[in-house]
């Protein structure tokens, strides 16, 4: 949280697991502190972690802007990310055990194209092997 308080316009991209739940929780805390936060979630909602579902409900109750994204919504994410002060990677953390595919892979590519915007990863950058530090494939 302290690393993010210097930013006003914040985009957080959240995966379906507990790393995504951490991003959602952070987004709520920043929203409470009057930051302009936009949350983007991807994945099958039926497979979201219990913590993820809890924070999604909390974010919706607090009216934090949240978008459930598939490939058709990536252009909206890109538009918001380009206007942000920081993009927070809460897609995958220490639980990742292979190459990232689908929407997450596209998001990695798009986030890597944001040259003038700070990027902060929760845990570790998505796509990085947590044991070896070697990328599985695409990595933020």
Regions found by a protein language model. Name each.
Residues 1:
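N-terminal glycine-/serine-/threonine-rich phosphate-binding loop
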Residues 4-140:
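Glycine-rich phosphate/dinucleotide-binding loop and adjoining beta-alpha-beta core of small-molecule
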């Amino acid at each position: 949280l302290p690393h993010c308080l210097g930013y006003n316009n914040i985009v957080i991209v959240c995966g379906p697991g507990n790393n995504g739940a951490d991003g959602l929780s952070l987004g709520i805390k920043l929203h409470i502190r009057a930051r302009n936060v936009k949350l983007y979630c991807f994945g099958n909602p039926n497979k979201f972690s219990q913590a993820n579902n809890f924070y999604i409900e909390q974010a919706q109750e607090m009216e934090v802007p949240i978008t459930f994204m598939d490939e058709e919504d990536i252009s909206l994410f890109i538009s918001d990310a380009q206007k942000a002060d920081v993009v927070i990677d809460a897609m995958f953390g220490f639980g990742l055990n292979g190459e990232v595919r689908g929407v997450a892979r596209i998001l990695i590519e798009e986030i890597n194209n944001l040259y003038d915007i700070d990027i902060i990863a929760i845990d570790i950058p998505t796509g990085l092997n947590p044991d070896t530090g070697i990328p599985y494939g695409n990595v933020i």
